[in-house]
Amino acid sequence: MDQLNVKEQQEFQQIVEQKQMKDFMNLYSNLVSRCFDDCVNDFTSNSLTSKETSCIAKCSEKFLKHSERVGQRFQEQNALLMQQGPK
């Protein structure tokens, strides 16, 4: 990053932010799709049943915790690779 001029740093930052937003939207989309498919079964009403609401809450919590754990493992592996240096 230090080798980039100010304009290049700004462009790089914008690319990183766009990538982060895309990743967040993919995570959100996957969460909605998975939890809806697993939890919503009754289409006779325009509102969720208490069972469906509870299922969605548990499903989304589990999904987000799993995603957080995966992210932590990637960070740990990246730190380990950085310590080892180039091969």
From Swiss-Prot:
InterPro entries: Mito_inner_translocase_sub, Tim10-like, Tim10-like_dom_sf. GO terms for biological process: protein insertion into mitochondrial inner membrane. Its main location: mitochondrion. Coiled coil: none annotated. GO terms for cellular component: mitochondrial intermembrane space protein transporter complex; TIM22 mitochondrial import inner membrane insertion complex. Disulfide bonds join 35-59, 39-55. A motif (Twin CX3C motif) lies at residues 35-59. One of its GO terms (molecular function) is metal ion binding. PANTHER family: MITOCHONDRIAL IMPORT INNER MEMBRANE TRANSLOCASE SUBUNIT TIM9B (PTHR13172). Mitochondrial intermembrane chaperone that participates in the import and insertion of multi-pass transmembrane proteins into the mitochondrial inner membrane. Also required for the transfer of beta-barrel precursors from the TOM complex to the sorting and assembly machinery (SAM complex) of the outer membrane. Acts as a chaperone-like protein that protects the hydrophobic precursors from aggregation and guide them through the mitochondrial intermembrane space. Heterohexamer; composed of 3 copies of TIM9 and 3 copies of TIM10, named soluble 70 kDa complex. Associates with the TIM22 complex, whose core is composed of TIM22 and TIM54. Interacts with the transmembrane regions of multi-pass transmembrane proteins in transit. The twin CX3C motif contains 4 conserved Cys residues that form 2 disulfide bonds in the mitochondrial intermembrane space. However, during the transit of TIM9 from cytoplasm into mitochondrion, the Cys residues probably coordinate zinc, thereby preventing folding and allowing its transfer across mitochondrial outer membrane. Belongs to the small Tim family. This is Mitochondrial import inner membrane translocase subunit TIM9. The gene is TIM9.
